[in-house]
Regions:
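Bacterial Sec-dependent N-terminal signal peptides
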Residues: 1-24
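A short beta-strand motif characteristic of beta-propeller blades
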Residues: 24-31, 67-74, 107-113, 148-154, ...
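Beta-rich, blade/repeat-based domains predominating
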Residues: 32-46, 75-91, 115-131, 155-176, ...
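Short loop/turn segments immediately following the C-termini of beta-strands
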Residues: 54, 95, 136, 172-174, ...
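Structural signal for beta-propeller blades
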Residues: 57-59, 98-100, 139-141, 177-178, ...
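Short loop/turn segments that connect beta-strands within beta-propeller blades
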Residues: 62-67, 102-107, 144-148, 181-185, ...
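Hydrophobic alpha-helical segments and helix pairs
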Residues: 91-144
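Blade-level signature of beta-propeller repeat domains, shared across WD40, Kelch, NHL, RCC1
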Residues: 241-267
Length: 267
């Protein structure tokens, strides 16, 4: 009897630790409003989405069901991509500057230029209001404190998606997923991905979903184990800078080439 029960227990523990995740498609937005959506950001305060419509230099505001609240919520941006919220302000990356937007007034209040920037991409902010901005073309990450930018990390090929958790900064290069602590000690979490990693969200303790703009979504644990969640490359549906609603477990995925945002339930 013991010889039967013990393997059963082992298999139960194994299946619990390495349970497979899946995505269930909930909705997709229309393809007429957005022009090359590069990034989507969920705002828990307003329970809405801010979508960077890169080719039109605008931010489109949507509800959590993909319906447009305001098409031209913000205009006059230049190749806008990733965004982050802090104290009622939305910070969005342009080509060589970070635009600062007053959310309540829906106006651009200032820009923070970054000298030497080549292609700013994603933005993340920590609890102290210190911002981090990736420069994909230069392979750098900048740090902005008190509106003063400085080079924080270099030699990060294709630096793109950023995420702050406590004192750690998580960084996606083109093919790897890394953690950088407060002393700038770099730990490689997982690598060997196909070139084109883009966005990153945390979906649980030590659990992440990362995107590859070509059209791939991965589930990754902090110990480096990973699982392919979705591959839509054959349908030419891209997966760019993603966002996540932890209460509803909905993942929001902008698709640059098809001009849509697609929502998936994470299971």
């Amino acid at each position: 009897m013991k010889k039967i029960v013990l393997p059963s227990i082992v298999m139960l523990i194994y299946s619990t630790l390495f349970a497979q995740h899946s995505l269930e498609k909930m909705w997709e937005s229309d393809s007429l409003t957005l022009r090359n959506p590069e990034s989507v950001l969920y705002d828990s305060k307003s329970n809405s989405l801010y979508v960077s419509s890169m080719s039109s230099g605008t931010i489109v505001r949507m509800d959590i069901d993909g319906k447009v609240i305001k098409k031209d919520w913000i205009t006059g941006l230049t190749s806008n991509k990733g965004s982050a919220l802090f104290n009622g302000l939305l910070y969005t990356a342009e080509t060589s500057a970070v635009a600062v937007i007053d959310v309540d007034k829906a106006t651009i209040v200032k820009r923070i230029p970054i000298e030497g920037a080549q292609m700013l991409n994603d933005v993340a902010v920590d609890s102290k209001g210190i911002f981090y901005v990736s420069d994909t073309r230069a392979g750098r990450v900048y740090r902005i404190e008190g509106d003063k930018p400085s080079v924080y990390l270099e030699n990060m090929p294709g630096a793109n998606g950023l995420l702050t958790i406590n004192t750690d900064l998580y960084v996606l290069t083109s093919t790897s997923f890394q953690k950088v602590d407060a002393n700038k000690v770099i730990t490689k979490i997982s690598d060997g991905f196909e070139s084109g990693l883009d966005g990153i969200v945390m979906i649980g303790e030590n659990e992440f979903v990362i995107s590859n703009f070509q059209g791939i979504l991965y589930y990754v644990r902090a110990d480096g184990t990973k699982q392919l969640l979705l591959d839509t490359r054959t349908n030419r549906i891209m997966s760019n800078d993603i966002s996540y609603n932890s209460k509803t477990k909905i993942l929001y995925v902008p698709s640059f080439g098809t001009n849509r945002v697609i929502a998936y339930k994470v299971k």
